[in-house]
Amino acid sequence: MDYRRLRMPDFDAIPRRDYLMAVLSGVLLALSFPSPGISPLAWIAFAPLLLACGRKDPRKAFRLGFVTGLAAYAGILYWITIVVTTYGKLPWIVSVGVLSMLVSYLALYPAVVAYLVRRGEERGISLLISFPLLWVGLEYGRAFLVTGFPWASLGYTQYRTLPLIQIADITGVYGLSFLIALANVVLFRIIRGFAAREPAPYPVKSVVLLLVLLLVTIAYGFKRLHVPEGGAPFKVALIQGNIDQNIKWDPSFQEETVAIYERLSRKACAAGPSDLLVWPESAAPFYFQDEPRYASRIKGLARELKTCAVVGSPAFEKDGERLKYLNSAFLLSPWGDVIGRSDKIHLVPFGEYVPMAKLLPFVNKLVAGIGDFSPGAQIAALDTGKGRIGILVCFEGIFPELSRAYVRAGSRLLVNITNDAWFGRSSAPYQHISMTVFRAVENRVPLVRAANTGITSIIDSRGHIRGMTPLFQEAVLNGEVRLGEGESFYNRYGDVFAWACVAGAAVVAALAFRRKSIHHQ
């Protein structure tokens, strides 16, 4: 074998300026997500990368796209190191390793987009078509591949721009991702035209197409924002206990934990009657079914306050000879009876279970202490007597298909209970809430959110955050929402737009691998 032919990639073949441009794209993309959440940057973030990739070999474009992905996702997901080091009690070098592996995996997506875009350009496929289709197609694929990780989809950068995000009730978040990707291509064409000093550098047709799509999107948004919410009024009281993660599961602290939630619940309901009291994920740090002393106190509290209550607590049930452990929420009636339970369906990999544990038994030894939870078996809309609710536990709120399923099952209010204490005072809680805003708009139902350490919030069916609490403070949040009708194109037909982009991306990829025509050689 001729080992002289085995060479490392020639990174020097790409000018340093182009690498800096790729890094700049990643930095701009990271800054567009919360926090700091400078959302306009998303509309220009890819222009430096596209300029760097111009007329380059597709393999070099792949490297540049990978560099952009590394810079972007390292900036967005840096908080992974906080979770692993501070709460996982693992050495910092392990946390950096975990972050590096995740970021490297995610960076493959923009790398593949850059590669296919350049191959497509060499075969006459317009960037105006290929880039938005490939970006959205792969972004949608990322939501399902390798357990699914739809965190930081491009459209989420615009969660506070209400006129823009109303289109999500038709296209989901992916419609905005498509529009942002398209805008970046148009900007790139304008810059390239002026830089090349072409006689007619202004891409008139591209600009007109973009402006028409933007105007239609914004006009639709303003129209939807002026449609009054017609559902029945429903009062909620949300409790933020601010229980320190380091003592949360300490049995000696259970009494104080329950007392904190009792005190805050009475404070919330003293401000006025409530139809639903909501405690966060695992607010009751014990098995609600198997701890009569504290469970009876919580049931008594619901009777005292004359309200339905959602209480986050682990649960268990028999599955043949073994016990299944579940991350659950119990619904209590105003009479203190348990009238429903919702179990978490989409578990956190390496947080609540170990993927492929049976095939890779050695992994369990490497991650000792990881929870051994089982996923819930069914989507259940729980009836409060005044309206049905769908409960999303923890990061289930980032999966559009779960919220859609709960609403299709009859839920008229989505309730997200979570414990974001793991994230510390990082960007992660803000990124988390930005995604739940879209679940309300997509399904045209309000969403209320109770988080152990924040951000607790009330979001109406238009995506307007009507109230939110600060991080790491005890807090109560009272408010009134209008129960949704759950009638939207997205709720009825799902990710039709995203699937159309997947199909378009597949066609682009197929054409990109065809033999070059003589005209383009």
Curated annotation (Swiss-Prot):
Which keywords are on file for this protein? Acyltransferase, Cell inner membrane, Cell membrane, Membrane, Transferase, Transmembrane, Transmembrane helix
Q: Which GO terms describe its cellular component?
A: plasma membrane
Domain CN hydrolase: where? 239-483
What Gene Ontology biological process does one annotation of this record name?
Answer: lipoprotein biosynthetic process
- Name the InterPro entries for this protein: Apolipo_AcylTrfase, C-N_Hydrolase, C-N_Hydrolase_sf, LNT_N
EC number of this enzyme: 2.3.1.269
Spell out where the chain crosses the membrane.
27-47, 64-84, 93-113, 125-145, 167-187, 202-222, 493-513
What are the catalytic residues?
Answer: E281 (proton acceptor), K344, C394 (nucleophile)
Localization per record? Cell inner membrane
Give the main EC class. transferase
Which membrane topology describes this protein? Multi-pass membrane protein
Q: Which SUPFAM superfamilies match?
A: Carbon-nitrogen hydrolase (SSF56317)
Q: What's the short name of a Pfam family annotated to this entry?
A: LNT_N
Chief site of localization: membrane
> Which pathway does the protein contribute to?
Protein modification; lipoprotein biosynthesis (N-acyl transfer)
One of the entry's Gene Ontology molecular-function terms is: N-acyltransferase activity
Q: Which PANTHER family does the protein's record reference? A: APOLIPOPROTEIN N-ACYLTRANSFERASE
Q: Which NCBIfam families match?
A: lnt
- Function recorded in the entry: Catalyzes the phospholipid dependent N-acylation of the N-terminal cysteine of apolipoprotein, the last step in lipoprotein maturation.
> Belongs to which family?
Belongs to the CN hydrolase family. Apolipoprotein N-acyltransferase subfamily.
Give the protein's recorded name.
Apolipoprotein N-acyltransferase
Q: Which organism is it from?
A: Geobacter metallireducens (strain ATCC 53774 / DSM 7210 / GS-15)
Q: What is the lineage of its organism?
A: Bacteria, Pseudomonadati, Thermodesulfobacteriota, Desulfuromonadia, Geobacterales
Q: Quote the gene name from the UniProt entry.
A: lnt
